[in-house]
Each structure stands twice: as C-alpha cells, then as structure tokens.
A protein has these predicted regions:
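Conserved N-terminal segment of class I S-adenosyl-L-methionine
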Residues: 1-108, 120-123, 194-207, 213-220, ...
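Short catalytic micro-motifs in class I SAM-dependent methyltransferases
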Residues: 110-115
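Short N-terminal helix/helix-N-cap motif within the alpha/beta-hydrolase-1
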Residues: 117-121, 148
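A short glycine-rich, Lys/Arg-flanked "PGG" loop and its adjoining helix->strand segment in the class I
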Residues: 121-135
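Conserved class I S-adenosyl-L-methionine
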Residues: 138-160
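Acceptor-substrate binding/catalytic loop of class I
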Residues: 160-177
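A SAM-dependent methyltransferase catalytic signature shared across enzymes that methylate proteins
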Residues: 176-193
Length: 261
C-alpha cells in the first residue's frame, strides 16, 4: 500500500471536505503540533482559523477559552463547523479581503495553502489582521518526501484521493519553497517542525500504546532527515518589523460585518 494516500473503504474523490480531511489527534501529527504551538497560552487569545474544515481545531481552542473566528470555503462543511466559533464567514479564500486590523494573536492555515491558486496572495491579504506580536501557523505537505521522490524515479506522478498528491492540491511545497514564500510575504520563520508519515492512518493498529516507541523513533529519524522524510511541515512565522499594511480599496472591503450566521 502506498504511504502517500490515506486508506478508506471507498474512494474519497468527490467526498465532502469534512470526510476527506479528518482530524489527526495522534502524537507528532500536524494537528498535534498546531495545537501545541498555542499550548503555552494560558490567558485567552484571539485566533483566526482559515479553512476550518469541520471545526476540529476551533472546537478545542474554544473549549480552552480562546476567542476563535473561522473562515471556510465549503458551505456544507461550514454548517458543521460554525457552532465552534464566535464568528464565522463562508467565502472564497482566493479573493477574501480579511477586513480586520491587528486583531488576532494567531492566524492558522492548517492544510489550506496547497489548495489555493495563489497562496502567497492569500497570506499577504491576511497580514493586516495579525497583531504586531502575532504569529502565523501553517501546515503543508512535503512534496519532497521520499515516497514521492521514489515515484518520480519510477516515472510516476499519480494523484491520489488523499495524501501528499491529493487530487485537490493546486500547489506543492518543499521546505525551501515554503520558506521562500514566507520571505516573499515579509515573514520570518521562527520554527519548523516536520511530521513523520502518518502510520496511524495507514495502519490503524499502530495507535496502540505498544507502538509508542516505534512512533518516537520514527519522529526522531524524521527530524534527522526532515527534507527527505517529513510528510508535512508545520511552521510558525511572524511579520518582519518593516512590514507595512497594504492599502485596501473600497472595492476590496466586504460589505457586511462578519458574524455567526
């Protein structure tokens, strides 16, 4: 079985986003590290969750007392998610103007940027929403993973229903290209965390505590050769001191207040 796809009894092609992209709560997953990036926040903070899916992360952050705003493209998925957020907007991320000014402590793009035609443009548009001391947390798949490299060596670049070569991915990232994009949007990457191959999804029986040493070893090896072995990268970045907010025209500003609907 290819480790680049997530096994399911039936094809996930055309499935709703909430079933295509399930919550990965297990240790060392991208969701594990995204949640951990905010674990030190004891007082409530303001979070903008961009691309909420079914609200997995928003539900946890809200339960912890944080103030969370959600943005989602898919209307059906949004209906499942909006109850976990103080405010919510269903919109196209390719054009959304982010009508906030220095409002959020964190902006999170969890498995989102690879689905956009121009992820750098989306990042630039969201930057005015971030407080001067705020952070952006991003997770993207690593197209330079050894599984994809081996497939290329064999003359294959086959899209899958899930995984690194998900059919819905429009952009592909290596660690270098991800860091370059953050530089282009005037952000400094302050932390990079690789995630190992999600063996718990490929082989569910490895969720047993018996396999904990195996997952510890797999993560340690992944950290040692992250550009080759990482399944995903989770980065934390902050705006540079010299970053200037762009001036938005009236046409770019949304016409209504963003509230839970």
């Amino acid at each position: 079985m290819s480790l680049s796809r997530m096994p399911k009894p039936a094809s996930a092609e055309g499935a709703p986003p909430e079933t295509r992209y399930e919550f990965k709560p297990f240790r060392y997953s991208s969701h594990f590290w995204i949640l951990k990036a905010l674990d030190h926040e004891r007082a409530p903070v303001k979070i903008l969750d961009v691309g909420t899916a079914a609200g997995y992360l928003g539900k946890i952050w809200t339960a912890r007392g944080h103030h969370v705003t959600g943005i989602e493209f898919d209307a059906a998925t949004a209906e499942k998610a909006r109850g976990y957020y103080e405010s919510f907007q269903v919109t196209d991320l390719e054009t959304f103007a982010f009508p906030y000014r220095r409002e959020f402590d964190y902006i999170v793009f969890a498995d989102v940027l690879e689905h956009l035609r121009d992820p750098a443009a989306a990042l630039r548009r969201c930057m005015p929403a971030l407080k001067e001391s705020g952070k952006i947390v991003i997770s993207v798949p690593n197209v330079a993973n050894w599984v994809v490299r081996l497939s290329l060596l064999l003359g294959k670049f086959d899209y899958m229903d899930r995984g690194i070569l998900d059919r819905t991915h429009l952009r592909f990232f290596t660690l270098r290209s991800l860091e370059k994009m953050m530089e282009e949007v005037s952000c400094d990457v302050v932390e990079v965390t690789p995630t190992p191959l999600p063996m718990q999804l490929v082989f569910p029986f490895t969720e047993s505590k018996f396999f904990a040493p195996f997952h510890e070893a797999l993560y340690a090896i992944t950290c040692g050769w992250k550009t080759l072995l990482a399944y995903q990268f989770v980065i934390t970045a902050g705006p540079r001191d010299s970053w200037q907010f762009p001036v938005l025209s009236e046409e770019m500003m949304p016409s209504r207040k963003l509230t839970k609907q």
